[in-house]
């Protein structure tokens, strides 16, 4: 039985993760952690999500809980995740990281920690999105430099980073397939007199509105035709189930930095 801890357990995604763990065979929720100043500290994690009492109370200190879990699932904020990363590294605990918005330097910290503990880090844990990444690689290689490529994403009003981690990952996959450096060819939004579109650039457009869980479209546009690869999520549960699947997959894995493509056997 894989003992799973959920960080940010009182938040929207944290509550969904608690539900997903409760539904997963071979997994048990053994710890739930949130901010130390949360008014919900001490509450039963099961009651937070309508499951009734499960005997796991919401804690405010990850370091005090390290003996209670095998793997930590963290969908929080880069600054929080990096602190948790150090705790897990020192304790030899595996991690599943769904936090987005890391800088290049911060991602390097994940890579360094993965030399000592197994980590699954993905911008998106949806099976459908990861299938789309595979399709995007194929589409980019087939369509090549004859198309203009734009990535359009939409999320709820509360999302704090833009473009989304998933949109950026999609851009990386396309750029890698075409032998381009995304940092050099990405164009983030357009305004005013921008001039004609530069060939070989990859454009990003962002929408933040309502309660949109997550929509992503990659547009390959040529003269006379276009190909669109789209994924739309209607529930956070799809991400939560993928994260729990990753946590179970990490059992007996050697230290390394994995992603959802590894979990799904798509490599």
UniProtKB/Swiss-Prot annotation:
Keywords: Amino-acid biosynthesis, Cytoplasm, Diaminopimelate biosynthesis, Lysine biosynthesis, NAD, NADP, Oxidoreductase. One of its GO terms (molecular function) is NAD binding. It is found in: Cytoplasm. Pathway: Amino-acid biosynthesis; L-lysine biosynthesis via DAP pathway; (S)-tetrahydrodipicolinate from L-aspartate: step 4/4. It catalyses: (S)-2,3,4,5-tetrahydrodipicolinate + NAD(+) + H2O = (2S,4S)-4-hydroxy-2,3,4,5-tetrahydrodipicolinate + NADH + H(+); (S)-2,3,4,5-tetrahydrodipicolinate + NADP(+) + H2O = (2S,4S)-4-hydroxy-2,3,4,5-tetrahydrodipicolinate + NADPH + H(+). Its EC number is 1.17.1.8. Its main location: cytoplasm. NAD(+) binds at residues 8-13, 34, 98-100, 122-125. (S)-2,3,4,5-tetrahydrodipicolinate binds at residues 156, 165-166. GO terms for biological process: diaminopimelate biosynthetic process; lysine biosynthetic process via diaminopimelate. GO terms for cellular component: cytosol. Pfam families: DapB_C, DapB_N. Belongs to the DapB family. PANTHER family: 4-HYDROXY-TETRAHYDRODIPICOLINATE REDUCTASE 1, CHLOROPLASTIC-RELATED, DIHYDRODIPICOLINATE REDUCTASE. Catalyzes the conversion of 4-hydroxy-tetrahydrodipicolinate (HTPA) to tetrahydrodipicolinate. This is 4-hydroxy-tetrahydrodipicolinate reductase. It comes from Ectopseudomonas mendocina (strain ymp). The lineage of its organism: Bacteria, Pseudomonadati, Pseudomonadota, Gammaproteobacteria, Pseudomonadales. The gene is dapB.
